[in-house]
Swiss-Prot record:
It is found in: Cytoplasm, Perinuclear region. Residues 643-677 form the SAP domain. This is Cell division cycle and apoptosis regulator protein 1. The modification Phosphoserine is found at residue 1157. Residues 617-628, 862-896 have a biased composition (Acidic residues). Residues 601-625, 1043-1128 form a coiled coil. It holds the Pfam family DBC1. The gene is ccar1. The keyword Phosphoprotein applies.
Length: 1157
């Protein structure tokens, strides 16, 4: 929390307080400039904070002017003094904090606090009463979204409840004692709290860190908590000295309000006095707070107001000097702008360009820098109880534990680290599913010996390529994949046993001499056989296929005398060996996986058929029993009986079926049955009348109910069938099948796959011995990964070339030459016009050439030092500082320049260079690729939030924890190669442009990879032993010398080849499936086209027939038309002839008529 101290960045707690009157005990007067942000005056800390309404400091991004805001609040307090005075006595339910400043104490009061030096304005101003003074802060950048609630806050509070392992702050914030940093708090202590909000927890606010504030009076604070009503009453102090007559209560209240309102501005305006400054130390939640003990001062009287004016004048003089300096700087800026008007115009245009360019690239929220590093050496060979407590504070240590040996240091030395990326996965079957092969292994044999136990931790890891893409955010990945990154600890998982609900345990058991062999301390294969047998019995996994068994850790317990299964076991030492086998060799091949899938499907079919047969058999038996009962108990209808002609046996059967007495003579039986038959006849007649009316309704209801029942039964059967099929279905990718032994551990055993991050998230409440073993293994595995990744980083730093300072020197020399040329030009008072023009042209040419050279140098620097444009948002703080430095250089050059043409050319050149750089950036964004993925994963494992950089102090701790015994000088020399502003931008080492895709891998067996270990005698002995072991790789097997190392290498090669072949086979199968789908689609389309062609041919035939018929009809019509025309022409001729003959006949008739007349 050092960044919250001093006067630069106030800490981010922003709670509002009501400041009226607060009473604090005397010992709370302490100088604490880191929390108040002002000078450590004699003024009481808690009363000053309460009077200012700032019981908790302001947030880090507090941008408002403190002086203006506090003066406005003081004025508002003075205006509301009269009204607030009445409310003080009429509203006792409000929380009122009494500020009893010892300005005018009651008569004969003992001054238990030091004297308070206040400004004169407090004594001379009119009485006022403080109203509620609150300080509003701007919303932090991370919480600008209005819809999201506040997830995290930092504040100061009081411990209200404290239990054995947890407590509460302000009755609302829950914290565990493991989160306390420094001194443990007591009930009533004021503490600094960093809390997070989680709505899914029982207590919404949970404290992540707790730190006790220094110099507190626990008795006084505790009394305030126990008696809150006393806070609202005026403090009565014993009388000792007669200082001044006590003012009336109203005047005293007004004076207190005046103090609380008027002391805001001088308190926070006063600068830190050099005489009162404390040495600056980095304080934080993770460090022990520096306690500053207030010096006791003699009791004295309050001096007249003239004493106050001195300190007020002193503060005013300091402020006036500061204002004079600010005004002087402003005048200098105005003079410089008046001397260069063109520069003023250029500066006025620059913000507009920024406003136009800003929407192109929105700034994203930079993630919080989170790095977790172990604070101890990672090559420790063993630990005892004290060392485990120091290393893992949240780890429960069993009472019988006394020693642990970390043998993974020898199993995975620095020269042969553990290789991630061996794909393996597990699939846990349901307890209903039976294994295909019967499991005959025994978990707890009768002769089990508790002196040795063997347990295994089985790894489930994705492939190396998948691990890179999911955790490293590669430069060539799409943005969705990069934003959804996961830490490698979330992707690396282990198969563990579960005893009960949340009790994880390693899979294994005790050694059996009869089943595993004798002498486990001498023969390492004995415990391996124990692990194979117990794992087979508990999970059904056959570990005999594993080729390498790494002895990861040995845990020893001192067991007292006990009774186990009726026999007394004397006191002994139990050694638990944790093995880490290469379980990925047990993964079934693709063909074996297909056979397993077929076997479980067949098992499901057999079970379904068996269940159906059982159901059918039960149904037949029920039907048969119902038929028999129906034959026996169903009486004959009354219309079919005639009691007078029935025999005695028949009469008795009918009476028994009607639950009537069958005893007596035949006449009695006949009379009894006849009477019953008459009753049945009458009832049936009545029922027939009712039945006719309700028969239809009942029939409909019965059908609907039967249909609903049938549908529900079918639906339940379908759901059950799908559920059972899902239990028997296997995933597409091959996995190791796990059948947990449900009868083991008193029927509470189960299996689960848990990630490394979940195993590391243990609690002190996990107080089981088997949970302790799993948690310890998780810590050791995490430390092994940290060591391997740290060595990878160290190896890369060793391979880097020394940093060249030649370019910096050239740049410096050219700047000096340029400055000298400018000075020579200024000394020339009266140059000739032509001469000046020619000199200006030369200068322009030189500047252009120099600008070109600068552009080349910038490009070279960009190619060498800043290739990661794709993740440039991660480096914005450092990039901003570099840009500020460049801007300062340009500003100095502009101040030195006096020619308008030079400024124009420079401005054009800068604009051209910026445009070119922006284009290059856009071009480089598309061309960045990650070439060193191993190194990127090493950095990402430590940089959990993917900030893109590691600070120098964290990188230094990483190198110190590797066990290489490096000196500080050696580490600093490594850092000079790559560090920039105390940080390492690791993307510069891992990413490069597409053109520079060639990457030289560093030699894993570097000469200096062991650091200074070779200089230590103890390490030399261990190295010699390891060389002897390496030379002893030949063994005699069946009369032949076998080189185990070469066999393992060949096995590894064959495994890689098999994996590649399976991958290719899978790819070919997928392609074949796609080709088959394509062929089927083509065949279907071909069939459709053939059908369409046939249909088209048929249509063409029909069209030809219709065409022929149409042609025949056309010819017929033509013949008919021809004949018609001929007939018409003949008729027309005849008509014409007739018409020609008719006129002569009429003329002859007319002449005859005229002659006769």
């Amino acid at each position: 929390m050092a960044q919250f101290g001093g006067q630069k960045n106030p800490p981010p707690w922003a709670t509002q307080f009501t400041a009226t009157a607060v009473s604090q005990p005397g010992p709370l007067a302490v100088q604490q400039s880191s929390l108040l942000g002002a000078s450590p005056t004699i003024y009481t800390q808690q009363s000053a904070l309460a009077a200012a309404g700032l019981a908790s400091p302001s947030p880090a991004n507090y941008q408002l002017s403190q002086t203006a805001a506090l003066q406005q609040q003081a004025a508002a307090a003075a205006a509301a003094a009269a009204a607030a005075l009445q409310q003080q006595y009429t509203q006792p339910q409000q929380t009122i904090y009494s500020v009893q400043q010892q300005l005018q104490p009651p008569p004969q009061a003992i001054l238990t606090q030091p004297a308070v030096a206040l400004p004169t304005s407090l004594a001379l101003s009119t009485p006022q009463q403080a109203a509620q003074i609150t300080v509003s802060y701007p919303t932090p950048r991370s919480n600008q979204q209005q819809t999201q609630p506040q997830k995290q806050r930092v504040f100061t509070g009081v411990v209200t409840k404290l239990h054995e392992t947890f407590g509460f702050v302000d009755e609302d914030v829950f914290f565990q004692l493991t989160a306390v940093k420094g001194k443990s708090p007591q009930a009533g202590d004021r503490v600094l709290v960093e809390a997070t909000y989680n709505p899914n927890m029982p207590f919404k606010w949970n404290a992540q860190r707790i730190q006790t504030l220094p110099n507190q009076n626990p008795a006084s604070a505790q009394s305030l908590i126990k008696n809150p009503a006393a806070v609202m009453q005026p403090v009565a102090q014993p009388t000792a000295y007669a200082v001044q007559t006590q003012p009336p209560p109203q005047a005293q209240t007004l004076l207190q309000a005046q103090i609380s309102a008027a002391t805001l501005t001088p308190l926070l305006q006063t600068q830190t006095s050099p005489l009162l400054q404390q040495p600056q130390q980095k304080a934080g939640l993770l460090q022990t707070p520096v306690r500053i003990v207030s010096q006791p001062q003699p009791v004295r009287r309050i001096e007249p107001p003239s004493r106050f004016s001195v300190r007020n004048d002193r503060g005013d003089s300091i402020l006036s000097r500061k204002d004079d300096r600010n005004r002087e700087r402003e005048r200098e800026r105005r003079r410089s702008r008046d001397r260069s008007p063109q520069r003023k115009r250029s500066r006025e245009r620059s913000p507009r360009r920024e406003r136009e360019r800003s929407p192109r690239r929105p700034r994203r929220v930079v993630p919080r820098y989170t790095v977790q590093i172990s604070k101890f050496c990672l090559d420790c060979p063993g630990c005892d109880t004290m060392e485990l407590r120091r290393r893992y504070q949240n780890l429960y240590i069993p009472s019988d534990f006394f020693d642990a040996q970390f043998t993974w240091v020898d199993a995975f030395p620095i020269s042969r680290p553990f290789q991630l990326g061996n794909y393996s996965n597990f699939y846990i079957m349901h307890k209903e599913v039976d294994p295909l092969e019967k499991n005959t292994a025994i978990v707890d044999p009768p002769d089990a010996d508790h002196t040795y136990s063997a347990k295994v931790m089985l790894l489930a890891s994705p492939s190396l390529e998948e691990l890179y893409h999911k955790s490293c955010a590669l430069a060539e990945d799409p943005i969705e994949v990069r934003e959804g990154f996961q830490h490698p600890a979330r992707l690396i998982k282990f198969l563990v046993g579960m005893k009960g609900k949340d009790e994880a345990m390693a899979i294994g058991g005790h050694w059996s001499p009869s089943l595993d062999g004798p002498n486990p301390d001498k023969d390492p294969s004995v415990l391996i056989r124990t692990a194979v047998r117990c794992c087979k019995a508990l999970t059904g996994i056959e570990l005999s296929l594993c080729t390498q068994w790494y002895r990861f850790a040995e845990i020893r317990y001192h067991r007292p005398e006990e009774t186990h299964k009726g026999r007394t076991v004397p006191a002994h030492v139990e050694t638990v060996v944790l093995f880490f086998p290469d379980v990925w060799h047990c993964l079934p091949t693709r063909s074996e996986w297909e056979n397993l899938c077929h076997g479980y499907k067949q098992q499901l079919v057999d079970k379904l058929q068996g269940d159906r047969k059982e159901a059918d058999g039960e149904q037949e038996e029920e039907d048969k029993e119902d038929g028999d009962a129906k034959e026996i108990s169903t009486p004959t209808h009354w219309s079919k009986l005639d009691p007078k002609i029935m025999k005695v046996n028949d009469l008795r059967k009918e009476l028994e079926s009607r639950t009537l007495s069958s005893k007596g003579l035949k006449s009695q039986l006949i009379a009894r049955l006849t009477k019953q038959l008459r009753i049945e006849e009458q009832k049936e007649e009545q029922k027939e009348l009712e039945k006719c009316e309700k028969e239809e309704e009942e029939e409909e209801e019965r059908k609907s109910e039967d249909d609903k029942e049938e549908e529900e039964r079918k639906r339940q059967e379908e759901l059950e069938r799908q559920r059972r099929e899902k239990r028997y279905m296997l995933p597409d990718e091959p996995a190791i099948i796990v059948h947990p032994n449900w009868s083991a551990k008193n029927g509470k055993f189960d299996c689960s796959i848990m990630s490394l991050s979940v195993l590391l998230d243990y609690r002190i409440e996990d107080n089981k011995e088997h949970s302790f073993e799993v948690s310890l293994f998780a810590e050791l595995f995490n430390e092994m990964l940290q060591r391997d990744f740290g060595v990878r980083i160290y190896r890369e730093l060793l391979a880097l070339p020394e940093k060249e300072e030649k370019k910096d020197k050239e740049k410096k020399c050219k700047k000096e030459d340029k400055r000298e040329r400018k000075e020579d030009k200024d000394d020339d008072d009266e140059p000739k016009p032509k001469r000046r023009k020619s000199s200006d042209d030369k200068i322009k040419l030189e500047e252009k050439e120099e600008r070109k050279r600068d552009d080349r140098r910038k490009e070279d620097y960009r190619e060498e030092d800043d290739p990661d444009y794709e993740n440039q948002d991660d480096y914005e703080p450092i990039a901003a500082e570099e840009d500020d430095g460049d801007y300062d250089d340009r500003e100095d050059d502009d101040d030195d320049s006096s020619s308008k043409d030079k400024r124009e050319d420079k401005r054009d050149g800068n604009r051209y260079s910026k445009e070119r750089q922006s284009k290059d950036k856009e071009k480089d964004k598309k061309q960045m690729v990650t070439v060193n993925r191993d190194l990127l994963m090493a950095f990402v494992y430590f940089d959990q939030s993917h900030c893109g950089y590691l600070l120098e102090k964290d990188l230094e701790e990483i190198l110190y924890t590797l066990g290489l015994h490096l000196s500080r000088a050696q580490v600093k020399k490594l850092f000079t190669k790559i560090l920039l502003k105390e940080s390492l931008l690791y993307r510069k080492l891992t990413d490069t442009a597409t053109e520079d895709g060639s990457h030289e891998e560093t030699d894993p067996l570097h000469n200096d990879i062991l650091g200074n270990c070779s200089l230590l005698p103890s390490k030399a002995v261990r190295t010699g032993l390891s060389t002897v072991e390496d030379k002893g790789g030949l063994i005699v097997y069946k009369g032949a010398m076998v080189d185990v190392g070469s066999l393992l290498q060949k096995l590894e090669k064959s495994e890689k080849t098999r994996t590649e072949l399976e991958h290719r086979l899978q790819t070919l199968e997928s392609k074949t499936e796609e080709d088959e789908k394509t062929i089927s689609q083509l065949e279907a389309s071909n069939r459709n086209l053939s059908e369409e062609l046939k249909q088209t041919k048929d249509d063409v035939g029909h069209l030809k027939d219709s065409l022929k018929a149409a042609e025949d009809t056309r010819s017929l019509y033509e013949d008919q038309l021809t004949n018609t025309i001929k007939n018409l022409s003949a008729a027309m001729g005849e008509i014409q002839v007739v018409l020609n003959k008719n006129p002569s006949t009429t003329e002859d008739q007319k002449s005859k008529e005229n002659g006769s007349s």
